């Protein structure tokens, strides 16, 4: 999944003062799609699946970090990404981080959303109460050894583990008609 809301630019603020990035991690423009990272991983890769997921041992029930239930792996009680597993913090510095579920809920609740096309790729223009905005491109997601859904849907990770199954984490998912927070399998990029 693309990582967007990384608090890079001091231009976009929602109601409680969270500052959002104006571009995806790994790019210097709002239009390219950015890089794809599995949840909690800090490197891009060529294949995305349980067999290549670094926070587990090859299956959804052998997680080695961020696990709340023993049926999914080694329980550690960690619910949100630590700074050593937050690609935004590692890349941009300690004041930067992947948004939490709460941050994304605020984006959904306090901002206006409008479908927009940039360089042939649709996405959503998200405008805050101060009139400033970010563009979330429909960048698709990586699974197996390919990226699918470019121009069809977008998925943007939060830093928050999904309560109903430690093999998932929350992400903002959207298509041309809906946008919502959902739990999704952690190995997707």
Write out the residue ranges for each language-model feature.
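Conserved positions within compact, well-structured domain cores
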Residues: 2-189
């Amino acid at each position: 999944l693309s990582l967007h809301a990384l608090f890079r630019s001091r231009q976009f603020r929602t109601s409680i003062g969270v500052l959002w990035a104006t571009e995806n991690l790994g790019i210097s423009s709002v239009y390219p799609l950015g890089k794809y990272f599995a949840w909690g991983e800090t490197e891009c890769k060529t294949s995305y699946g349980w067999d290549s997921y670094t926070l587990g041992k090859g299956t959804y029930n052998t997680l080695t970090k961020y696990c709340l239930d023993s049926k999914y792996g080694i329980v550690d009680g960690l619910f949100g990404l630590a700074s050593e597993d937050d690609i935004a913090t590692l890349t941009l510095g300690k004041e930067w981080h992947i948004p939490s579920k709460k941050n994304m809920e605020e984006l959904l609740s306090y901002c206006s959303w409008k479908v927009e096309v940039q360089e042939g790729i649709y996405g959503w223009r998200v405008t805050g109460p101060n009139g400033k905005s970010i563009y979330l491109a429909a960048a698709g997601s990586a699974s197996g050894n390919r990226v699918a859904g470019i121009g069809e849907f977008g998925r943007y990770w939060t830093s928050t583990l999904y309560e109903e199954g430690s093999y998932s984490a929350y992400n903002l998912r959207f298509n041309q008609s809906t946008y919502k927070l959902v739990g999704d399998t952690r190995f997707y990029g």
